[in-house]
């Protein structure tokens, strides 16, 4: 085929970009270096059980609007279960069970109401939640783009009398003056927002929470699990900037924005394989095992795969930050700033331990384990509608444990499961599989280099990926947002 656009990388970013272009009748060729699609969000077959196992447990939120748009496009949105209201069961380190259940109220009142009735908290903790409630309500407004505006133009009509004309002129002058004042106010808002963001970049999530009067108990049970799950970094390390952006997204106007959404299929069945079918049905093509290199010596992106030249009107490079240098081995001067930033970007790992038991140990889809190394446990077969015995335990921001041996991690996971779930103490663990993603996400610690934009200095070359500057952390939604934005930018080239 002679593609209009080449997409390099077949994760959420690359496939969402490719499918969005195919939807607009653009011929797309997707190149993936690995033998399978999905990038860092994929699945493999466990040789002992024959089951498809995700390379990490991925949880979404109800506010992942562009992700759901992508899944609707490829016909798999029904394979995600979205809670009607945010409900989270937890078992703390003392073995106490509790449930956070948020009623259907306008956001963030639903969260405050849920916290106020959460039996795991004391009144001091609940009062602390009220104190931060106002800050949460202000977050979305603060983070909206503050645009500079010019004076409002006035459409003049034919005034039949001088009095009416004078009145119209006075109204126009007032409109002009108010427009200038509004522009100054918005400019001031922009400057205040910039200053606030700069301050947040130097403050950790824990420091920000303490500054808003949050108690240790509330931090451990609510804010730390949310922050670590979203940012994949301990709250003593992660900068508050991205966490505040997460609050703006999760606690938007729709109370279901904060609801958890669980895939009901392995990740390759959820999006990778359906996206491939979608592309091929629309005249596109997907190649795996295709190691692509880009040469921009002629001020345009020229793609090579194993010595085979490929030409297209535009190229989207949707590889992770740590793989960018491999795609541009000649290190073009026009991309030196982006390549330097990518090379200096640190990574944060995730460890997932899959355990199989000889009997049912829980009837719940997922349970939070605050204060433990394994922060969440998911019953995979309950999620997939089968008999339960396969648990997936997740440790996000796992720099402190990623270097342990497989057996040490399995022993740790078994200990924490049995500590939290008494039924598991009499169950026999029949198999354990450890999945390490050492570079699961980019770091959001203070001092990281700036994230690049979709556009590059090279005409016809665009970037996509969860590490692109979307304002979101390294999430599925961040990847899809970048893919859709890249597709929109490409349409200006291929129209």
Each language-model region and where it sits:
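N-terminal Rossmann-like FAD-binding beta1-loop-alpha1 element of flavoenzymes
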Residues: 3-30
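Conserved FAD-binding subdomain of flavin-dependent enzymes
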Residues: 48-82
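Short beta-strand to alpha-helix junction loop
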Residues: 59-63, 196-201, 212, 254-278, ...
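Mobile amphipathic helical/loop "lid" adjacent to a hydrophobic cofactor/ligand pocket
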Residues: 68, 72-73, 78-240, 244
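Conserved flavin/dinucleotide-binding core of flavoenzymes
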Residues: 101-103, 362-363, 367-495
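Helical element adjacent to the flavin cofactor pocket in flavoenzyme catalytic cores
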Residues: 246-302, 310-314, 318
């Amino acid at each position: 085929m002679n593609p209009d656009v080449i997409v390099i990388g077949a994760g959420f970013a690359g496939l969402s970009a490719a499918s969005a272009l195919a939807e607009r009748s653009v011929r797309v060729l997707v190149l993936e270096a690995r033998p399978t699609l999905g990038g860092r969000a994929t699945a493999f077959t466990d040789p002992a059980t024959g089951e498809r196992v995700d390379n990490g447990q991925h949880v979404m939120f109800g506010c992942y609007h562009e992700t759901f748009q992508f899944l609707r496009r490829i016909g798999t949105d029904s394979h995600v279960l979205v809670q009607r209201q945010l409900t989270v069961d937890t078992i703390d380190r003392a073995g106490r069970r509790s449930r956070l259940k948020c009623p259907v109220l306008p956001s963030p009142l639903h969260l405050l109401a849920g916290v106020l009735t959460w039996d795991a908290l004391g009144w001091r903790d609940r009062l602390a939640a009220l104190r931060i409630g106002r800050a949460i309500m202000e977050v979305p407004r603060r983070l909206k783009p503050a645009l500079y505006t010019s004076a409002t133009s006035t459409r003049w009509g034919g005034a039949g009398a001088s009095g009416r004309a004078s009145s119209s002129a006075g109204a126009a002058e007032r409109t002009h003056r108010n427009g200038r004042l509004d522009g100054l106010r918005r400019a001031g808002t922009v400057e205040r927002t910039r200053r606030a963001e700069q301050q947040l970049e130097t403050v950790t999530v824990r420091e920000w929470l303490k500054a808003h009067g949050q108690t240790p108990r509330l931090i451990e049970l609510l804010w730390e699990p949310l922050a670590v799950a979203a940012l994949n970094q301990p709250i003593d390390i992660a900068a508050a900037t991205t966490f505040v952006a997460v609050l703006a997204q999760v606690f938007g106007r729709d109370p279901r924005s904060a609801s958890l959404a669980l895939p009901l299929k392995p990740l390759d069945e959820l999006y990778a394989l359906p996206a491939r079918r979608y592309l091929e049905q629309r005249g596109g093509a997907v190649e795996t095992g295709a190691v692509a290199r880009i040469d921009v010596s002629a001020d345009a992106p020229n793609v090579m795969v194993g010595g085979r030249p490929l030409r297209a009107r535009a190229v989207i490079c949707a590889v992770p930050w740590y793989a960018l240098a491999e795609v541009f081995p000649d290190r073009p001067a026009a991309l030196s700033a982006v390549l330097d930033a990518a090379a200096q970007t640190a990574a944060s790992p995730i460890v997932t331990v899959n355990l199989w038991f000889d009997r049912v140990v829980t009837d719940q889809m997922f349970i939070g384990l605050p204060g433990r190394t394994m922060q969440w446990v998911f019953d995979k077969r309950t999620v997939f509608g089968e008999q339960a015995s396969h648990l997936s335990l997740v440790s996000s921001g796992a720099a402190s444990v990623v270097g342990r041996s497989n057996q040490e991690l399995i022993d740790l996971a078994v200990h924490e499961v049995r500590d939290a779930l008494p039924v598991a103490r009499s169950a026999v663990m029949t198999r354990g599989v450890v999945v390490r993603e050492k570079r699961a996400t980019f770091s959001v610690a203070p001092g990281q280099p700036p994230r690049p934009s979709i556009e590059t200095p090279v005409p016809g070359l665009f970037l996509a990926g969860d590490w692109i500057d979307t304002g979101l952390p390294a999430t599925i939604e961040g990847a899809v947002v970048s893919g859709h934005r890249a597709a929109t930018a490409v349409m200006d080239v291929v129209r």
